[in-house]
Amino acid sequence: MGKGGSLSEGVIKNIIISYTYVAIWIFLSFTVIVYNKYILDKKMYDWPFPISLTMIHMSFCSTLAFLLIKVFKFVEPVSMSRDTYLRSVVPIGALYSLSLWLSNSAYIYLSVSFIQMLKALMPVAVYSIGVLFKKEGFKSETMMNMLSISFGVAIAAYGEARFDVWGVILQLGAVAFEATRLVMIQILLTSKGITLNPITSLYYVAPCCLAFLFIPWIVVEFPILRDTSSFHFDYLIFGTNSFCAFALNLAVFLLVGKTSALTMNVAGVVKDWLLIAFSWSVIKDTVTPINLFGYGIAFLGVAYYNHAKLQALKAKEAQKTAQQVDEETGRLLEEREGNEGGRKNEPED
C-alpha cells in the first residue's frame, strides 16, 4: 500500500480513537447522572442524602487521584505552594462542594430531563459572571443570545409537569456556583500560569471539598443517618457509583487534546438529548411538548453561542499565527540586510 494509503489509515485510526473516547465520555457522564438519580430518588433506591453521596465520591476520587499521582506516577504532579493552595484552590474547592451538593440535591425533587433543560442556563451564568468580574467583554449580540437561552428555559419550565420550586432553586444555585467556579479558575489559577487537568484537580480540590462538606453534613445529615438503624452501607452500589464518577474524570483527562472544542460541545448536546429520551422512555418521567419546544429554543441559543466562541477562538489563533509569521519574516529580512551590509563593507583585493 502506498504512502497515501498509510496516511489514510493513520487518519482513520486517529478518528476512531477520538470518537471512542467521546463515546466513553458520553456513556460515563450519562451513567453518573442516572446512577445518582437512582440512589437519591425516594421512588427508587431511596437514599436521599446528597451531602453524604458527594462526600463518598470525594473520598474515593481523592484516594485514587493520590495513587495515580504519587504511587503509580501515571500523572505528573503540579508543584504548588501552601500560599497558592490557600488563596487559589480553597475558594475553588468551596464553590465546587456547593455546586455538587446542590446539583445532587436537585435529583430528589426534579426529573432528569428537566434538570438537563435547566443546565442549558450554564452559558448564561458563565457569561454574566465573567462580565461581572471583567473576564468577558459586554456585547449586545451575546446578551441577546443569553436572553434567548433564558427565554427557552423559561418556556421549558412553564411546561414542566413535575415542577418543584425548591428543586428549581437548588439546580439554579448549582448552576450559579459552578459558573462562578469556572470563572474563578480563570482568575485564580489560569492567570497565574497554573494548569490542572481533571486528575490533578481531584488531587488538590477533592480533599478540600470533603472538608467543606463535613460541616453541613454534621448538622443536616449525620443525625438522621445515626438514627436510621435500618440502613446498611452497600459497598457494591456506592463503590460502583464512586468508580463511575472517578472514571468520568479520567475520561475527560484522556480526551483532552484528542478532540476539538466543537466535538466536545456536540458530544455534550448528544448526551443531553439521550438523557431526556431515557428519562421519558425508561424512568417514565413526563416530557411535554412545551418542555421540548422551550428546550429546543435554548438548545439553538447554546449551539449558536458555542459556534461563536469557536469562531472567535479560531480567529485568535489565526491572528497569533499571522503575527508569528510576520515576526519571523521581519527577523529574516534583518538578517539578510545585515549580511548584505557586511559584504559591502568587506575590503576589495
UniProtKB/Swiss-Prot annotation:
Region (Disordered): 321-349
Residues of the EamA domain: 38-156
Listed GO CC annotations: Golgi apparatus; membrane
Transmembrane segments: 15-35, 49-69, 89-109, 113-133, 141-161, 165-185, 205-225, 236-256, 263-283, 286-306
Entry membrane topology: Multi-pass membrane protein
Keywords linked to the UniProt accession: Membrane, Sugar transport, Transmembrane, Transmembrane helix, Transport
Record Pfam families: TPT (PF03151)
A Gene Ontology biological process term: nucleotide-sugar transmembrane transport
Basic and acidic residues bias: start-end ranges: 328-349
Source organism superkingdom: Eukaryota
PANTHER family in the record: SOLUTE CARRIER FAMILY 35
Family classification: Belongs to the TPT transporter family. TPT (TC 2.A.7.9) subfamily.
Protein name: Probable sugar phosphate/phosphate translocator At5g25400
